[in-house]
Amino acid sequence: MTRKATGSILLVLLSLYFLTCAAQKPAEKFTIRSGVNVSHWLSQSEKRGEERLAYITAADFAKIAAIGFDHVRIPVDEVQLWDSTGTREEEAFNLLHMAVNAALANKLRVIVDLHIIRSHYFNAKSNTLWTDPREQEKLADMWRQLSAEMRRYSVSMVAYELLNEAVADNPEDWNSLVAMLIRQIRADEPERTIVIGSNRWQAANTFPDLRVPENDAHIILSYHFYTPFALTHHQAWWTDFSEYGGPVNYPGQVVDTLLYRDLSPTAAATMRNWANGYFDKARLEREMAPAIQYAREKKLPLYCGEFGVYPTIDNEIRLRYYQDLTDIFRANNVAYCHWCYKGDFPILDEKGEPDSRLVAILTAK
């Protein structure tokens, strides 16, 4: 064999080697830092037709990126994506694809969050998802369809959240469902990032009860944080203490306990039992500690997928709370997603423009 022939063979072998290495290069990870929920559109909304088409458009994702966020969480409901017979609602699926493509065009990562299904709503008194195997199979089928729709998108850019704020009476019911859904998705999408919350509204203090698959690096743990409720949900109409319209403070005692005398027995009991108290930055961090510790033990990234303050309290107090909260997130390497973009806890003012002081806090490096 001539030197020329030997050199040619070596060149071919080297080319094959480098091509193989390139093919085996791991996909870019799904990495996020600060985002916003695009809520009350494909979830928790009666909007349909032209009203739904106009509520969120591609321009909104350009605005979100320009503000400085790096991802969006898009809640979707079963009633929007499928009718009562299980038939797909094509317009809603088309809107979901529009949203994902618009987000990607603006370099925003996306979490598709299955928020409410007919058998499970986080504020319902009872949910048949935990008692009826047929409803669990329906949920599995929803994820078969969503996975088939979404797998066209890069695993580095789109992630799935299995279910928002599971509220099983027994945490093992949620753990079993998580294991089943992950096995199913992994059969077709071994590297897709899956977001998993703890049982009971994704509360930080329920993380010790959560079980996640071992040796699965493509998982993000998620908790929600609205503590203290007397501050974050001041005068929110759906709470049982909405009648309280008095002052709110932070840091310090959120609501003066002497003011309980002016409340109904139900509202006073809620304030006394869990919604009120003395809160400062140190207390907030202690409240988050179980989730932070669990994520460290599991060596998995942690994400606060929802937090926010109803815009009815003094704005300086509101911003002070946001500043402490985001400082804690960043100090503990917790990614976070504000609830929400438009809607009840908005980052936009009445003219549709970003609240400059709020978004500066939310997007600070």
PLM regions: where:
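Bacterial Sec-dependent N-terminal signal peptides
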Residues: 1-26
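N-terminal carbohydrate-binding accessory modules
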Residues: 22-71, 86, 294
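Surface-exposed, active-site-proximal loop segments in enzymatic domains
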Residues: 44-51, 78-94, 118-135, 347-353
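An active-site-proximal structural segment forming one wall of the substrate-binding cleft
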Residues: 54-55, 61-70, 88-116, 124-159, ...
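Short, solvent-exposed turn/loop segments enriched in Gly/Ser/Thr/Pro and often Arg
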Residues: 75-77, 114-118, 198-200, 337-345
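Active-site region of glycoside hydrolase catalytic domains
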Residues: 133-278, 285, 289-310, 331-334
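Aromatic-rich peripheral "rim/lid" segments of glycoside hydrolase catalytic domains that contact
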Residues: 313-365
